[in-house]
């Protein structure tokens, strides 16, 4: 299983995905989540989770970042479905964030009309 760049995201696609994990990293390492969180994300992929890791550049406008990473994530899902790389009609989606990524997933779930099976929040940062 190799990382693929799709619509500004880094994606791991197992042969038979059981769920989708949208991963957002911490503020200082968020620009390359496929490298800085490689061990964790590839372990998830090996367990059958389709991983979409969305890089971002940190600014003080966290709602704008949340909107941007959500748009990139949704574009990646659309592209995966259009190219038949994602064949399942429905898979549960989990948001997973570390530090600043936690805050972004909380903003995404609070501000935007999305459906998530749940969020996994690792070391929440409240700045």
Tell what function each PLM region has.
Residues 51-54, 62, 82, 113:
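Short, solvent-exposed secondary-structure capping/transition elements
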Residues 41-47, 71, 110-114:
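Short, surface-exposed basic-aromatic patches at helix termini and helix-loop junctions that form
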Residues 89-127:
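Primarily recognizes the serine-hydrolase "nucleophile elbow" in alpha/beta-hydrolase
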Residues 38-42, 68-72, 124:
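Amphipathic alpha-helical scaffolding segments
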Residues 2-59:
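Short, surface-exposed "cap/lid" segments of acyl-processing enzymes
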């Amino acid at each position: 299983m190799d990382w693929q760049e799709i619509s500004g995201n880094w994606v791991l696609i197992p042969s038979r995905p059981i769920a989708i994990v949208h991963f957002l990293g911490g503020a200082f390492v968020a620009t390359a989540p496929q490298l800085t969180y490689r061990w964790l994300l590839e372990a998830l992929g090996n367990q059958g989770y389709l991983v979409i890791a969305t890089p971002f550049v940190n600014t003080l406008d966290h709602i704008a970042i949340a909107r941007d990473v959500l748009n990139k994530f949704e574009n990646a899902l659309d592209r995966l479905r259009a190219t038949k790389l994602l064949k399942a009609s429905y898979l549960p989606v989990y948001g997973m964030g570390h530090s600043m990524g936690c805050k972004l997933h909380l903003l995404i779930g609070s501000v935007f009309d999305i459906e998530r099976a749940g969020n996994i929040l690792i070391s929440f940062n409240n700045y």
